[in-house]
Amino acid sequence: MLLPIQTSINSRLSQFTRSSFYASTISFAVGTICLLVLNIIIHPQVLTPEFFSKQTLNYTWVLGGLLGVIYLTGNLLLLPRLGAALTVVITVTGQIIMGVIIDTFGLLGAHQQSFTIFKGVGIIFLITGIIFMNYVRRHPVNRHKNTPIVFWLLIGFVFGFAPPIQTTINSTLAQHTHSSIFASLISFSVGTIALFILTLVFNRSLKISSTHKTL
């Protein structure tokens, strides 16, 4: 329930920032601050030099945050083109299919689970639902008519791969650091830094307009 609300709010914010990257930066920065406060209250020991000196830095410290950037920014690009409902459905479909692949093959250190007929039937129902939603969608919510909607559906499906991979990576980091809240903080911090750099490169401004721009 919260995902489409978050996406809609961030999409609205991007109309004032004039940049999807900038809107995502603000979203990640707020999340980072909240997680930092939680870590200070619940696990202050994870923020000490002694704790960091005992850790082994690897891809789990970086990749999770970058995948979060891809997913959040991707949703901001998709929402004005597909609408909230179809954006959520197509990305969730990608999440479920990637989640099934990770479980079936035990990728990224995940516990391997066998593929069942029920999972297959569920995926078929999801794809059928997307087809019906696209079929009855006679009036596009945007003016991007030059690009076929199938293209954006495919992009949304691929963007949906990011969250289950990110969750698996962050889970591994949480096991190594013995703190899921700290793992989330690292993920958000990396995402915030990456988005801030992208904002400076592509937007070249940190101004927020008082009037919004219709996407």
Q: Across the structure, where does each feature detected by a protein language model lie?
A:
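Helix-helix packing/entry segments at the starts of transmembrane helices
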Residues: Y22-S27, G74-V100, L185-I186
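Extracytoplasmic gate region of multi-pass secondary transporters
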Residues: F159, P163-S171, Q175
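C-terminal transmembrane-helix exit sites in multi-pass transporters
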Residues: T91, I97-I117
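Membrane-interface interhelical linkers
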Residues: M1, I5, I9-Q15, F21-T25, ...
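Short, solvent-exposed interaction modules
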Residues: T60-L76, L215
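Hydrophobic/aromatic residues within the transmembrane alpha-helices of Major Facilitator Superfamily
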Residues: M1-I5, I33, L66, T93, ...
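Residue positions within transmembrane alpha-helices of multi-pass solute transporters
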Residues: I5, I9, V37, I70, ...
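Hydrophobic transmembrane alpha-helices of multi-pass small-molecule transport proteins
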Residues: F115-V136
